[in-house]
Regions:
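Residues at beta-strand starts and edge strands
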Residues: 11, 35-37, 55
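A broad "ordered helical/assembly scaffold" signature
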Residues: 1-2, 35
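A short acidic/basic microdomain associated with nuclease active sites
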Residues: 21-45
């Protein structure tokens, strides 16, 4: 079984790299061991979120012996951290890899990469981030649902995100997103980092919903969109 896992993830890695290179992109980060693969890439395309604050398009992939996820990836140049847009329509989740012939599994990955490379995927993500940069957040109404999910990852994660958020002069949804993704950048555990980058992407895309409070404050209501379940 171990030999199969190594072969499958190696094939996926090579296919991913080929697809990215064919589109003038480059692989920026790779973690690969038998049965587990994390890889991120970027392309030359850029968008400006604020003055002198540019983001770069990309694709991120995670694969194990039983599943793979391929999503659009947005890399913020000024802080060198990225967000995984797991809720993008162009993203693909591929279950039951271990029941597919290698060629078929690799073909599905190639198709997923192609989907995530669509220019509309990056344009939509950049516009969502611009919108997030214009919306201040309420610590309790907006942030608490996300902080609860952060605490589920690790007891210290939520506290670290809050510290980073309040240390920066950006009290918007975009600022909150970047507090999460900057912590992801500095996290050594690959699974935790991926989940933080996914959560950062979700913060960017979640639309404010009216709170029933009398003062008319807005609250974000995140949906639980963790997708495929991976074993560590």
């Amino acid at each position: 079984m171990c030999d199969f896992d190594r072969f499958m993830t190696q094939e996926i890695l090579e296919a991913f790299t080929e697809e990215i290179s064919a589109r003038e992109g480059k692989v920026t980060e790779t973690f690969h061991q038998p049965g587990q693969l994390f890889i991120r890439s970027v392309f030359p395309q850029m968008e400006e979120i604020r003055a002198r604050d540019h983001v770069q398009s990309g694709v991120a992939l995670r694969a194990t012996d039983s599943a793979a996820c391929v999503y659009p990836y947005v890399f913020r140049l000024v802080c060198r951290n990225g967000a995984i847009m797991a809720h993008a329509a162009e993203g693909r989740e591929i279950p039951n890899l271990d029941s597919l012939p290698t060629f078929e599994a690799v073909s599905l990955v190639r198709e997923a990469v192609e989907s995530c490379c669509e220019r509309d995927a990056f344009a939509a993500a950049a516009e969502q981030m611009r919108t997030a940069a214009q919306h201040p957040v309420d610590v309790f109404l907006t942030m608490m649902p996300f902080l609860s999910r952060l605490s589920a990852l690790d007891a210290q994660v939520a506290a670290q995100v809050l510290e980073r958020f309040f240390n920066e002069n950006d009290q918007t949804r975009y600022g909150f997103m970047n507090a999460v993704t900057s912590l992801a950048r500095d996290t050594r555990d690959h699974v935790t980092r991926w989940r933080l980058e996914e959560l950062g992407g979700q913060i960017a895309v979640t639309q404010p919903a009216r709170s029933p409070s009398d003062d008319g404050s807005e609250a974000l209501i995140p949906t639980d969109g963790d997708g495929l379940v991976f074993s560590r």
